[in-house]
Amino acid sequence: MMTYQEIFNEIKNKAYFKNHRHVLIAVSGGVDSMNLLHFLYLFQDKLKIRIGIAHVNHKQRSESDSEEAYLKCWAKKHDIPIYVSNFEGIFSEKAARDWRYAFFKSIMLKNNYSALVTAHHSDDQAETILMRLIRGSRLRYLSGIKSVQPFANGQLIRPFLTFSKKDLPEIFHFEDSSNRELSFLRNRVRNNYLPLLKQENPRFIQGLNQLALENSLLFQAFKELTNHITTTDLTEFNEQSKSIQYFLLQDYLEGFPDLDLKKSQFTQLLQIIQIAKQGYYYLKKDYYIFIDKFSFKITKIVPKTELVKDEKMLEYDSNLCYRDYYFSFMPKSNEDQGQVNIPLFSLSSIKLRSRQSGDYISFGHFSKKIRRLFIDEKFTIAERQNAIVGEQDGEIIFVLVGDKTYLRKACKHDIMLAKLYIDKLEKG
């Protein structure tokens, strides 16, 4: 066990708070965060900072409200601002974590805190590494938790990360009974797996932390050795060995944290880049990769930007120009008059428009969302933006996209009453 002064002596040279004046402390009420709160309160003058407290009441235990009340009382007694949020929704580890960090971010932005400080220590680091090993995470994610990383409008700082739980002083805190519930993987790792592994190797936790450190150094070295390579330049990228391409692409994807590709999706993406076939390819979560003759880039397209908000009504026995096409809604004829000829079973007006969210077309025994049709057929963003949907009597009767036309499957006993002729207008 260490004293706060000893902890301060080790932390001060790391200059965690050099560029910060107002820092927000995430406090759950457990022994780790209470130690962090007391430590930063005692040494805030020497660190030249002012602190605030952020607490999330998850409302999962009967003690939660009394813990919140205690922290409010402590903050008032010590003249420290405190911010509290009550979790809402269906509880899960991930949902709770997302709620906490969204709350912390909002408080930082609203109240000009430039740093969020959490009480993670080396035992947490070891637990995280083991959990990621169990889940089959990629090598780069075995670097574990970073002591400093960007967050909100500033940084997320973990000053206790080099200390173990046993280094922290005994202090008043609340015991979270849910920490013993084995339905959570972290609790199984902490209470079951790690104790057994430490019986085999008493220094197992130190070994995991050393693994994380060496892994971090390995990837830092890789970045330094490849920083002369422009990853998105197809010529440069394809001059590299397959193994270097693999890690270059992983590095590039670090810039898109919410893309979160699975291993199989990553492999497919790498193959697309290696083939270098020009065009737009959908990835996930509205992300696309665009490949031209010389380079590639990943971009996020907001679905609404795919929609051009204009529409026209085409009446029976009339014609009009819409986008790059000439449409004629005419009585049925034995002769086909247009480049595209669509049989019609109603004389109601036809609405010509862009795709809208939720649009689908019936192909008889099954229907398909038009968005999924675009993805499956690998149409480019430009082709999707210019696609034309024909709607009659509240149903989509055709989709014109790229150089293809997709027709609704008519019922067996429908009687053809008219035809829609479509011709592409020549430019010039």
Swiss-Prot record:
GO terms for biological process: tRNA modification. InterPro entries: Lysidine-tRNA-synth_C, Rossmann-like_a/b/a_fold, TilS/TtcA_N, tRNA_Ile_lys_synt, tRNA_Ile_lys_synt_N. It catalyses: cytidine(34) in tRNA(Ile2) + L-lysine + ATP = lysidine(34) in tRNA(Ile2) + AMP + diphosphate + H(+). The N-terminal region contains the highly conserved SGGXDS motif, predicted to be a P-loop motif involved in ATP binding. Belongs to the tRNA(Ile)-lysidine synthase family. One of its GO terms (cellular component) is cytoplasm. Transmembrane segments: none annotated. The gene is tilS. PANTHER family: TRNA(ILE)-LYSIDINE SYNTHASE-RELATED (PTHR43033:SF1). Keywords: ATP-binding, Cytoplasm, Ligase, Nucleotide-binding, tRNA processing. This is tRNA(Ile)-lysidine synthase. It comes from the Bacteria. Its EC number is 6.3.4.19.
